[in-house]
Regions:
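Terminal disorder- and signal-encoded targeting elements
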Residues: 1-371
Length: 371
């Protein structure tokens, strides 16, 4: 029989699983639409551009260690307030439930929440904000140095109970920098630390200790262009910033017979966000290219214009390409695009329908195949 003792991997898997059903739970709006610090509902007004998480408390500049080269945030409160997003998820779940068998698949977000509560005995709507970070090396991201900081409404006992629910033994406790660390028995691989009431970090021991040092003011946090680009992203559902490794973006990778973006190799940092205004969903990507920022903007605008004029580009796609905005500010070039909310919902529902159709065809072909 396989052992069910805790390992760092099992802890990380439990944390990831929790984040998954928590994200779904946030869409249900069960906690009644929380507001930001100024009393304005988050995710429903025109973005301020002051940076993501202004409604929450996770600031990478005071939490994420300087060794990290990539940061990704998820603002669950923005999702919580987004009725349109919830409509799309309900449509998808409803269609998937029709495809499923046995009546065990949730019909909508609310029923998914109830199933999650029964399974984990933890309220998914208690997750407010998540911040994932990792080191970036020349070969790409380094999963050995990665962590997740969570801002929640859960008590320490509630979260520990969830993490221990699949194990045969209790997590062990230790202390570092005045903070409690929970880890697998007889393991030095890592675990989870309590940073403050409702705030936790999951990761390897080195990462946990670095986060505690930064939180206590005893360690260096991310700074410079990486931190600036992140803080300049538009408030929204998700945001990211990352170092771009040398040779990760090359002219050859972004060239065709008709289009060449020569300055793409000058990009050293990238950031972006997915956000919502009163009438549209939007995406933006910013690229720090130093003195080549203006050249990069020119290259991108030329490439977009050429793409819109290609013979195999439909009129609908050409119109959307033309709506992409390209701006340069100092050493940073930003691309952004916004789409009407109802159009986005229509596309999402159409995609769900196509996906269900593919699943049905696959199921039918599998059921009639003989060996």
């Amino acid at each position: 029989m396989a052992s069910r003792e805790f390992t760092r991997r099992s802890l990380m898997q439990k944390g990831a699983a929790g984040a998954g059903f928590i994200a779904l739970g946030s869409l249900a709006g069960c906690s009644g639409g929380d507001s930001g610090e100024d009393g304005t509902p988050t995710g429903t007004e025109t973005p301020t551009g002051d940076g993501p998480g202004t409604s929450g408390g996770l600031n990478p500049g005071s939490i994420v260690p300087a060794q990290a080269g990539a940061v990704v945030s998820v603002d669950m409160q923005a999702m919580l307030d987004d009725d349109d997003l919830r409509d799309v998820v309900n449509t998808a779940l409803g269609e998937l439930a029709k495809f499923g068998e046995g009546g065990e698949f949730p019909q909508d977000v609310e029923s998914a929440i109830e199933m999650a509560r029964e399974e984990a005995d933890l309220d998914p709507t208690g997750f407010n904000e998540g911040l994932l970070f990792m080191e970036v090396e020349s070969s790409g991201t380094d999963e050995e140095y990665a962590g997740v900081v969570m801002e929640t409404d859960w008590s320490e006992d509630e979260l520990i109970g969830f993490l221990e629910s699949d194990g045969d033994s209790e997590l062990e406790q230790s202390e570092y920098g005045g903070k409690t660390i929970y880890s697998a028995p007889d393991s030095d691989d890592g675990g989870m630390a309590v940073l403050s009431d409702g705030r936790y970090v999951i990761g390897p021991t080195e990462v946990i200790e670095d986060v505690i040092d930064v939180s206590n003011g005893d360690g260096d946090a991310i700074a410079g262009e990486l931190a600036t680009l992140y803080s300049d992203t538009t408030d929204g559902h998700m945001a990211f910033a990352t170092v771009v490794p040398d040779d990760a973006l090359t002219e050859e990778d972004f060239s065709t017979d008709e289009i060449t973006i020569e300055s793409v190799g000058q990009i050293e940092y990238m950031s972006g966000s997915v956000y919502k205004t009163d009438s549209a969903y939007g995406v933006e990507t910013s690229m720090w290219a130093g003195d080549a920022a203006s050249d990069l903007a020119d290259d991108i605008e030329f490439a977009l214009d050429a793409a819109a004029r290609m013979e195999d580009t439909s009129d609908e796609l050409a119109t959307r390409i033309e709506d992409v905005e390209v701006e340069t500010s100092g050493q940073t070039t930003t691309m952004s695009y916004e789409e009407d909310i109802e159009e986005v919902k229509s596309y999402a529902e159409e995609y769900v329908g196509e996906l269900i159709g593919m699943l049905m065809l696959f199921g039918m072909s599998s059921g009639t195949t003989t060996v």
